[in-house]
Structure formats: C-alpha cells, structure tokens
Amino acid sequence: MSQNQEISKKEQYNLNKLQKRLRRNVGEAIADFNMIEEGDRIMVCLSGGKDSYTMLEILRNLQQSAPINFSLVAVNLDQKQPGFPEHVLPEYLETLGVEYKIVEENTYGIVKEKIPEGKTTCSLCSRLRRGILYRTATELGATKIALGHHRDDILQTLFLNMFYGGKMKGMPPKLMSDDGKHIVIRPLAYCREKDIQRFADAKAFPIIPCNLCGSQPNLQRQVIADMLRDWDKRYPGRIETMFSAMQNVVPSHLCDTNLFDFKGITHGSEVVNGGDLAFDREEIPLQPAGWQPEEDENQLDELRLNVVEVK
C-alpha cells in the first residue's frame, strides 16, 4: 500500500470517528430535550456556514437510522448582500436531493439604511431574519425550526449576558417563539465548535462567508469567543466544566428570589440541599468535571456503537 493510500485510509478513519462523535452529540441532545418527534417536518435553516452545513449533514444521517419518521426541508434566506453567490446553495442541495426553499428578502438594504456606519448590525439583522424565518416555517408547514448554534455559542451567550446584560441567561437548546406558534431547536447544542470545524474542512462544504456581520471588528461576541478559546488552551477542560454547570443549576445557592423562596426559610423548615456547606471549604476535583483528555475520548469513541437513537 502506497503512502498516499495510507494517509487517505487514516483520514477516512478519523473522519468516520469524528462523524460518530457528532452523531452521538446530536442524538443525545435530541433525546434529552425531545427535539424531534414522530411526523415532524424540520425546517433546517441553512446560512452557508460550517455550522448549518454540519447540522444538515448529521440530521440527514440520523434520519436514515432513527426509529421515528421525520422530514427535512432546507431554507436559506438570501439577504441580498453584495457578492452573495446565489448559485452555491441550490446546486449543493440539488446534488444531495434535499428539498429546499430560497427566500429572497433585501434585509441587507434595510440594515444599511437604519444602522449608522461603524455600528454593529447584528441585533437588527437577527430580528429581521427571525421574523422572515417564522413566516416561512408557517408557509412550509414546518413543525420545528432547526438552528445551527453549538455548545460554544451557548457558552458565549451566557457570558455575554453576565458581562453586559446582568443576567444568568444562555441560549436554550429548545424554545417556544414569543407568539407561541413555533418551536425552535438547536440540535448541535452538545457539539464542540472545533469538531464542527474539522468536520466541515474534511467534507469540503462550499462555505459562504457573511460579509455583513463577520467583517465587523471588536464585536462583543467575538471578544467573549476569544476569551473562551484562550481559556480552553490554557486550562484544558474548563469549557466542558462550564457547560456542565449550565446543566447542574442549584437555585438555593444563587440570589434569585424568583427561583428560590429564601424568605420561606425559617426555623423548622426542611434542610436545603447542601445549605450548610456554605460554611465549609469547597472540595474541588483535581480534574474538571465532565472532561477527559483527547486521547481517552478517542479511545472511547472506538468502543461505542455507531447507532444513535432519536426519541
């Protein structure tokens, strides 16, 4: 066997292993939050970025082995940005044989008209985009709207709200729209951005950059993203631990009186879970909770079956 064949074989092995991990992450998120149910019609929002391409690919893959029936329709919003390659997504989706719809709305022109030069456009752009996608979901008869946000996006949102909004608020894996008509799901909620990036590179998706928001310097989200990436490099496992913390909230040890009845604690009350530990030194584990070295993780992947059950 030639050296090139050996490299190709190794690359394919690594790609299969990576895809299994992403399948497992997505399958677990779907099961944990009951994202997809029998007969669902999922509107997959496809921007042309690595995240949405990966989401569509993994959902298509799961669709073949899932114990329930659900359909997919890919939707792209053409916002009329200058230089947007209109042919890329239709050609890609037709090659896959995926049902799709391209929605054309000049939100770019509205944003440029309303937002002064130098100001960030993300807020208005996202509001306009959200309204159009909700309308499109109704027109298509979609029961769920799938967005491509991943674990890193969720953590970034948590820190953005803490640093700038004064709220302990993240980005939920599943939510009901404000009008109560649409359910939004984020199947990549458990997926790492670096895994998605590696998968997108290996699959050579035809990436379309966002020239409107991606080119804006000093965005608050970008500052947070850089901070988290730096933490991940310097303190391996910290990202995993922080995400685990979002899944293990103890309301009695925070300060929100809407979440816990502090006034109701009186003599004779039941013991609050872990309440008296406030006097003791915290026992901190030697390794971050929910984290294991890359090598161990890869070995575990080899032992797992390539089957993800969608409930």
UniProtKB/Swiss-Prot annotation:
[4Fe-4S] cluster binds at residues 122, 125, 213. Its main location: cytoplasm. One of its GO terms (biological process) is tRNA thio-modification. Pathway: tRNA modification. InterPro entries: Rossmann-like_a/b/a_fold, TilS/TtcA_N, tRNA_Cyd_32_2_STrfase, tRNA_thiolation_TtcA_Ctu1. It is found in: Cytoplasm. Its cofactor is Mg(2+); [4Fe-4S] cluster. Binds 1 [4Fe-4S] cluster per subunit. The cluster is chelated by three Cys residues, the fourth Fe has a free coordination site that may bind a sulfur atom transferred from the persulfide of IscS. CDD domains: TtcA-like (cd24138). The thiolation reaction likely consists of two steps: a first activation step by ATP to form an adenylated intermediate of the target base of tRNA, and a second nucleophilic substitution step of the sulfur (S) atom supplied by the hydrosulfide attached to the Fe-S cluster. Homodimer. This is tRNA-cytidine(32) 2-sulfurtransferase. The gene is ttcA.
